[in-house]
C-alpha cells in the first residue's frame, strides 16, 4: 500500500511533466517572465528599423535576460515620441502608429510565449476634442481597447495567447473609419 501511494504521484509527474509553465514539451510557455522596460531609451520620435528595434529590446531587458531573438518588422514604430499626444516630446517609451498609419512590430522569440502583458496608454487623453477612445492594440490578432483617461497614465493590457507562439505581432488599429491606431508603450512582459 505504501509503495502505491508513492508511485501514483511519481507516475503523474513523469507522464504530465513537472510544470506546465516550464516551457518544456507540452508546456508552451517560457517558464520565466521576460520584462522589457523602455524607460532607459533616450530618443524622442526616431523611427525604428528592425535592427534598432532589436537593439532597443536588448538594452531594455530587465536583468539582461532576453527571449527576443530578432525583430522582423518595425513599421511606424518609434523610439520615444515627438510632438503630439499625451506623451509628446518624451523619451523612455515606444510609440506605435502615426496620424496616417497604424504601427506594427513583429518579434521572434527563443521559445514559445503564452502570455504577454503590455504597459501602455492611448495616444490622447480624454478631452472635449477626444471624448471617447477608439485606439486598439493587438497581439497575434487579439485586439484590446487601450487605457484612456483625462490625465496621462499607464495601464496593463494582458494577452493570454490562444496558441503558444514563438512569433509576436504587436500592432495598433482604430475602430473609426479613416483613422489609425496610435499608442505609447512603456514596458512589455513576455511569459
Predicted regions and their residues:
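Terminal, low-complexity interaction segments
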Residues: 36, 40-54, 58-65, 78, ...
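Bacterial Sec-dependent N-terminal signal peptides
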Residues: 3-8, 14-40
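Extracellular ligand-binding interfaces
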Residues: 98, 109-111, 117-148
Amino acid at each position: 500500500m505504501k509503495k502505491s501511494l508513492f508511485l501514483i504521484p511519481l507516475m503523474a509527474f513523469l507522464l504530465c511533466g513537472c510544470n506546465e509553465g516550464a516551457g518544456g514539451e507540452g508546456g508552451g510557455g517560457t517558464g520565466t517572465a521576460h520584462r522589457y522596460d523602455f524607460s532607459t531609451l533616450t530618443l524622442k520620435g526616431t523611427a525604428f528599423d528592425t535592427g534598432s528595434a532589436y537593439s532597443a529590446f536588448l538594452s531594455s531587458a530587465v536583468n539582461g535576460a532576453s527571449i527576443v531573438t530578432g525583430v522582423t518588422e518595425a513599421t511606424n514604430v518609434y523610439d520615444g515620441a515627438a510632438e503630439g499626444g499625451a506623451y509628446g516630446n518624451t523619451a523612455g517609451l515606444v510609440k506605435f502608429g502615426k496620424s496616417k498609419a497604424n504601427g506594427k512590430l513583429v518579434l521572434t522569440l527563443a521559445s514559445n510565449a503564452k502570455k504577454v502583458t503590455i504597459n501602455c496608454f492611448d495616444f490622447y487623453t480624454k478631452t472635449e476634442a477626444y471624448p471617447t477612445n477608439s485606439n486598439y492594440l493587438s497581439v497575434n490578432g487579439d485586439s484590446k481597447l487601450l487605457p484612456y483617461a483625462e490625465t496621462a497614465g499607464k495601464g496593463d493590457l494582458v494577452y493570454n495567447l490562444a496558441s503558444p507562439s514563438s512569433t509576436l505581432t504587436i500592432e495598433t488599429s482604430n475602430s473609426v473609419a479613416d483613422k489609425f491606431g496610435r499608442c505609447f508603450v512603456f514596458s512589455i512582459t513576455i511569459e
